[in-house]
């Protein structure tokens, strides 16, 4: 048996200023599954995390609520911890960045960087709120857009026209905190000399530490030249003061990743077998993995490894990046009830339903994952209840009634047993590579074979025949052993189901190696239902509970009000029904969206319309600067528009969007349940 690996695993630190939602849970469930698999295999795997508990946003929210920042982060940490525990995310330690371990490590790393010449200082001119006595980040400044004249826009970009600009370009600026007119003021800032580590980062990011798509994105930043990173903020600020610099604080993103180290150090104080230096020293042989979302890639793949290198610590073995979560093909929405908090989900549904669904769709890539609620119900009910649990419920009763609960020693189908054994390494390989979707497909294929074999043998029919009792017991004992195999393979995903199954099977906690064994002449405990079906009414109740209170907006909307859109673009001349009916509108799935070289406004869309593929060039680039966000989304497509030859290729139709143009282009999407190829009537 190979020597046990030493592994330290982290997930990104949730910000201590709000509740956990299902988008967050994607990452923690993904990480927890991988960690549970490692532990089930016998490896020493430690999983740590913490609340990210510093920054102006926390300071200002606490002030607004009339409490201290310390009280706020304590309340939020308790809420986060309860949500994670109830979703069966089993951290070895869940800490806070506002802790003495983190203060000491942040100061030590900063001082090492400073003493090695990797810290620079210079004066920075910023807006200052004279009433609050604080410098203002861009998001705390509002005013009139210098490009289009739209009012109430943020200090760095306009949500109306999409323009970006410097805060000093904003017209009529005001503090979003106090409403005061800000003044320009100089302040000394501290910068981490990231360019000092450019050569190291170019090598490290191409050494197998990142997925290829992530490494390619990082290469774009590296090729564009690295800039020094501002790591300081001025008082008042909730965080750690910079050593020897009164009134200057570490920017939250400096001490946040150090929180991984601090949480582990806090755990080491309670677990003597863990040696902090053995995991974090420069020549450590232990493995270190960070699981993160694609929105924080630059911090974890540029700033963080450079800080570690400069301070004399080891760098991560790998940074595993996942995509965003959509619900029913769209961004989560409070008005649609699809912005679902973890606690709201838990109030209505079993956490293992979501753990399995996420696992079934997760791959090792960075693609976004869609939580399609209709598919969610179907997959859980079919796979977990209809396939896995069904095996035990089919067989257990015959063993209890016919043999007092004692499983006989039986292997009536050696070929099927061998198929389960042969599949184990492939399933393990998929878990190891974070290709959980492939692992679930392999497991469900085995469940299908087990159910088909039991259905073919039909013990319920044999049980009615004279002299067939021995055969019935052999079939059902073998069926229970196949069920046990599936439980072993699913245990990282479904720990509660595994615990309940272990109680029914009357066995110790199952390890991965147990898949090689069969229970023989073994007593079972009484069988009770291990999992129930999802009722669609529970999904509906969860959605309703997630919806914002829109009563005020609805009452406002009830009064007839014009918005000027018909003035901007008057109604077209009337047409008859036949003219409209000649247009063939179809539902299309956007399989791929990409930039078109040499085109300022176009995106190339590859559409799935059910039984065919279509290529469309669409002038929506200004509204969708990240084309990949469109992939997996349903839209409306004019299917019988004559193909148009363009210099970039052939455009086979048109997708539908609303809006005047520029950043105000809104691609149309059908309601949930629509399928590619369906005609719009």
Swiss-Prot record:
GO molecular function terms attached to this record: ATP binding; metal ion binding; methionine-tRNA ligase activity; tRNA binding
Q: Does the keyword Aminoacyl-tRNA synthetase apply?
A: yes
> Which residues of the sequence carry a binding annotation for ATP?
334
Got a GO cellular component term for this one? Answer: cytosol
Q: Which cofactor does it need?
A: Zn(2+)
**UniProt keyword list:** Aminoacyl-tRNA synthetase, ATP-binding, Cytoplasm, Ligase, Metal-binding, Nucleotide-binding, Protein biosynthesis, RNA-binding, tRNA-binding, Zinc
Q: What is its main location?
A: cytoplasm
Co-factor binding details: Binds 1 zinc ion per subunit.
Which E.C. number(s) belong to this protein? Answer: 6.1.1.10
The record's listing under PROSITE patterns reads:
AA_TRNA_LIGASE_I, TRBD
What is catalysed by this protein? tRNA(Met) + L-methionine + ATP = L-methionyl-tRNA(Met) + AMP + diphosphate
Q: Output one GO BP term.
A: methionyl-tRNA aminoacylation
| Positions occupied by motif 'KMSKS' region | 331-335
What InterPro entries does its record include?
Answer: aa-tRNA-synth_I_CS, Anticodon_Met, Met-tRNA-synth_bsu_C, Met-tRNA_ligase_1, Met-tRNA_synth, Methionyl/Leucyl_tRNA_Synth, MetRS_core, MetRS_Zn
Q: Which residues form the tRNA-binding domain?
A: 579-681
Q: Where is this motif: 'HIGH' region?
A: 14-24
**Compartment annotation:** Cytoplasm
- One Pfam entry for this protein is Anticodon_3
Q: Which Gene3D superfamilies match?
A: HUPs, Isoleucyl-tRNA Synthetase, Domain 1, Methionyl-tRNA synthetase, Zn-domain, Nucleic acid-binding proteins
Q: What does this protein do?
A: Is required not only for elongation of protein synthesis but also for the initiation of all mRNA translation through initiator tRNA(fMet) aminoacylation.
**Can you state the subunit structure given in the record?**
Homodimer.
Family classification: Belongs to the class-I aminoacyl-tRNA synthetase family. MetG type 1 subfamily.
Recorded hits in NCBIfam families, A to Z, give: metG, metG_C_term, PRK00133.1
Q: What's the protein called, per UniProt?
A: Methionine--tRNA ligase
The species this protein belongs to is Azotobacter vinelandii (strain DJ / ATCC BAA-1303)
């Amino acid at each position: 048996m190979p020597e046990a690996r030493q592994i330290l695993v982290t997930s990104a630190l949730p910000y201590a200023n709000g509740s956990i939602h299902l988008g967050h849970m994607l990452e923690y469930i993904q990480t927890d599954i991988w960690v549970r698999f490692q532990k089930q295999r016998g490896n020493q795997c430690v999983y740590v995390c913490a609340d990210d508990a510093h920054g102006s946003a926390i300071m200002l929210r606490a002030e607004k609520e009339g409490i201290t920042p310390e009280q706020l982060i304590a309340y939020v940490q308790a809420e986060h911890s309860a949500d994670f525990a109830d979703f069966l995310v089993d951290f070895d330690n869940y800490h806070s960045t506002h802790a003495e371990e983190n203060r000491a490590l942040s100061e030590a790393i900063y001082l090492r960087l400073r003493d090695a010449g990797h810290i620079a200082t210079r004066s920075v001119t910023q807006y200052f709120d004279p009433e609050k006595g604080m410098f203002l980040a861009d998001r705390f400044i509002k005013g009139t857009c210098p490009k289009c004249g739209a009012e109430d826009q943020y200090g760095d970009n306009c949500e109306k026209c999409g323009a970006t600009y410097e805060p000093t370009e904003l017209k009529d600026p005001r503090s979003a905190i106090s409403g005061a007119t800000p003044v320009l003021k100089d302040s000394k800032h501290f910068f981490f000399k990231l360019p000092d580590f450019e050569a190291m980062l170019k090598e490290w990011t191409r050494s197998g530490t990142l997925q290829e798509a992530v490494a390619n994105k990082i290469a774009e930043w590296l090729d564009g030249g690295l800039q020094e990173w501002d790591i300081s903020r001025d008082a008042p600020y909730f965080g750690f003061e910079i050593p020897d610099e009164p009134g200057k604080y570490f920017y939250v993103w400096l001490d946040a990743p150090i929180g991984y180290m601090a949480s582990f150090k806090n755990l080491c104080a309670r677990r003597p077998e863990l040696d902090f230096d053995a995991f974090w020293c420069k020549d450590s042989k232990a493995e270190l993995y960070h699981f993160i979302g694609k929105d924080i890639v630059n911090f974890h793949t540029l700033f963080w490894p450079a800080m570690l290198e400069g301070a004399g610590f080891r760098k991560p073995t790998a940074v595993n990046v996942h995509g965003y979560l959509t619900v029913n093909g769209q961004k989560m929405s409070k008005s649609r009830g699809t912005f679902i908090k973890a606690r709201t989900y838990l109030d209505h549904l079993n956490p293992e339903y979501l753990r399995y669904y996420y696992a079934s769709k997760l791959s090792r890539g960075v693609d976004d994952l869609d939580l399609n609620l209709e598919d969610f119900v179907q997959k859980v009910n079919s796979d977990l209840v209809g396939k896995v649990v069904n095996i035990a419920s089919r067989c257990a009763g015959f063993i209890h009634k016919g043999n007092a609960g004692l499983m006989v020693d039986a292997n009536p189908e050696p070929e099927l047993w061998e198929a389960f054994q042969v599949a184990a390494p492939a399933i393990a390989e998929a878990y190891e590579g974070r290709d959980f979707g492939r692992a679930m497909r392999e497991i469900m294929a085995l469940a299908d074979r087990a159910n088909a074999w039991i259905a073919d043998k039909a013990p319920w029919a044999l049980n009615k025949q004279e002299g067939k009792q021995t055969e019935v017991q052999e079939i059902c004992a073998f069926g229970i052993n196949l069920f046990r195999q599936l439980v072993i393979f699913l245990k990282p995903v479904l720990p509660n189901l595994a615990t309940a199954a272990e109680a029914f099977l009357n066995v110790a906690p199952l390890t991965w190696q147990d898949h090689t064994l069969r229970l023989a002449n073994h007593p079972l405990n009484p069988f009770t239902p291990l999992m129930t079906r999802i009722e669609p009414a529970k999904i509906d109740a969860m959605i309703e509970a997630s919806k914002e209170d829109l009563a005020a907006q609805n009452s406002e909307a009830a009064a007839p009000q014009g918005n000027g859109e018909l003035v901007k673009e008057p109604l077209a001349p009337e047409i008859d029904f036949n003219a409209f009916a000649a247009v063939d509108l179809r539902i299309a799935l956007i399989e791929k969206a990409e930039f078109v070289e040499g085109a300022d406004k176009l995106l190339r869309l590859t559409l799935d319309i059910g039984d065919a593929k279509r290529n469309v060039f669409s002038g929506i680039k200004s509204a969708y600067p990240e084309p990949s966000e469109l992939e997996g989304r349903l839209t409306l497509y004019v299917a019988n528009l004559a193909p148009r030859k363009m210099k970039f290729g052939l455009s086979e139709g048109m997708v539908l969007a609303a809006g005047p143009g520029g950043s105000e282009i809104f691609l149309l999407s059908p309601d949930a349940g629509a399928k590619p190829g369906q005609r719009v009537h």
